[in-house]
Amino acid sequence: MTDKQVYPVSPEVAERALVNKSQYEEMYRQSVEDPNTFWGEHGKRIDWIKPFTKVKNSTYDYNNLSIKWFEDGVLNASANCLDRHLEQRGDQTAIIFEGDDPSVSRNVTYRELYEETCKFANVLKDQGVKKGDVVTIYMPMIVETAVAMLACARIGAIHSVVFGGFSPEALAARIVNGKSRFVITADEGLRGGRAIPLKKNVDSALKHEDDAKVDKVIVVSRTGNDQVPWTEGRDLRYEDLMKNASAECQPEPMNAEDPLFMLYTSGSTGAPKGVLHTTGGYMVYASMTHQYVFDYHDGDVYWCTADFGWVTGHSYILYGPLANGAITLLFEGVPNYPDSSRMGQVVDKHKVNILYTAPTAIRALMAQGESCMDGTTRGSLKLLGSVGEPINPEAWEWYHRVIGNSKCPIVDTWWQTETGGILISPLPGAVDLKPGSATLPFFGVQPALVDNEGNILEGKTEGNLVILDSWPGQMRTIYGDHERFVQTYFSTYKGMYFTGDGARRDEDGYYWITGRVDDVLNVSGHRLGTAEVESALVAHDKVAEAAVVGYPHDIKGQGIYVYVTLVQGEEPSDELKKELVQWVRKEIGPIASPDVIQWAPGLPKTRSGKIMRRILRKIAANEHDQLGDTSTLADPGVVDELISSRAFK
């Protein structure tokens, strides 16, 4: 194996792993050669009210697009997360809640979660929620959010979770697009020691948008703030409604292809895009990927640091883990509050075995230095995961060495809101690891690299990442706009699902995600992935974070414009700029030499931590009057600072 450092599967990991290398190869072969047999068998991993007899019925034919899995089966997602476990593990912890305040935590058993879910399902029915209705959930990371999602699933309502950091405008757009008449929120959320005015934002959203026809707003008391505005007749207190609700509620029988939830992806421009996931295939896929990718064994304590407002929170805090009877940790706070040792403290406090987090969080801790883990042992950890964007090798190595004590394999998972679950990732007992590579496809997933004309490229190469055939967790449509679904994902390369990402494949068949295709630079006719240049910059010991975009260049077509955030204590200078240019030349080659370096106090990020390169491209091109939708920015002030300090006016 090449491509720099390789971490072979250790004997200890291999011994306890669910799948070894030869098993992975055989299972993968069957999954693509005979998907009906493979998924027919693995579809039985969840409980069916009426078993399916049909497995896969899908075609990527552009004129006849159809994606259906287990289509004659009947099931209920909440029953698969709760009821099926009551006999064997009713008294086992289902959710460990860790509050924003480190002194606040509690364990919720499967039986308690079942009873709360049934009660709230009855509350929703009493308020007029019916099967097929869209319920908007705008909540903090608390147990009641999990209850709300599961209660919707129990009665066949479609939940639409909107991240609690989104603005009233963004919330309003999602309520209107989903034709949602019911909103569940909290008086306030707590995050990093600050109160987030959720109820106030809901009120603003409903005033802001004339088309928002909301009948009921159910409000959970999180902070007990009695100053929140109240609209009699519309607003209802969660606690009052739950007092007399019955703890028995029969799960609604759902066809496998009935919708389970929708989740809006920001899309760089245009109307919100409501990604719709259905019940059967999604549950099979979320549960199976959770078990195999994280090598989950009974009793493991599993912590995914995502938010319910993102697909990672849906698939890998809630549905996947609970379907598997797992112990899942629900974290209200942020990794650096009250200080940067919090992540290590939570791991030690709850004896976390599996940690799944984002490169953004890892790089933020890296910038603080290794001392951020002082006073914590993290000795319980046996597996680490990464999600959200490609992880640069330097962050991978730091994560492995500092957080994982050099003993935990890292599963670098590549997937999307649209895919429902992980598509490319190592299985820890089967695949040797290369820092920065998502490695190999999961069962049933057939990735390919194509050129701009759609020709499939073989062997060691680089191109546009497509998937050649359907898998059970795949989205079925964009809510209310099937034509946009077909156009967005299936029109670029006919007969293939286009991911929008670029990738390279090395001589071992490993996939390396190079970033969104619009994040590929064409410098003097050479293709350069921005992730590659960013990786090189972040490898420099004075650089905390870097973002790379193209800008119009008279000679090269595109020049390389770099935004650099320095490590605490380092000072910007012209000498350091020259040093960084030489560093990149050394790491990648002269073709990758940055043309412009701008010092950045921070980078514009969405609330899920993704860098908004679209905005950085506009600033670099001096088009800051055309920034487009900035409602998803975590800190809009960063943009103003970058515009005022732009490297050339």
Swiss-Prot record:
UniProt record, GO biological process = acetyl-CoA biosynthetic process from acetate
The transmembrane residues are: none
Task: List the InterPro entries hit by this protein, alphabetically.
Answer: Ac_CoA_lig, ACAS_N, AMP-bd_C, AMP-bd_C_sf, AMP-binding_CS, AMP-dep_synth/lig_dom, ANL_N_sf
Q: Which reaction does it catalyse?
A: acetate + ATP + CoA = acetyl-CoA + AMP + diphosphate
Its cofactor is: Mg(2+)
Q: Where does CoA bind?
A: 191-194, 312, 336, 524, 585
Name the EC number(s): 6.2.1.1
Molecular-function GO terms, alphabetical: acetate-CoA ligase activity; AMP binding; ATP binding; metal ion binding
Q: Which PANTHER family match?
A: ACETYL-COENZYME A SYNTHETASE
Q: What does this protein do?
A: Catalyzes the conversion of acetate into acetyl-CoA (AcCoA), an essential intermediate at the junction of anabolic and catabolic pathways. AcsA undergoes a two-step reaction. In the first half reaction, AcsA combines acetate with ATP to form acetyl-adenylate (AcAMP) intermediate. In the second half reaction, it can then transfer the acetyl group from AcAMP to the sulfhydryl group of CoA, forming the product AcCoA.
The family annotation for this protein states: Belongs to the ATP-dependent AMP-binding enzyme family.
- This chain belongs to the protein called Acetyl-coenzyme A synthetase
What gene name does this entry carry?
A: acsA
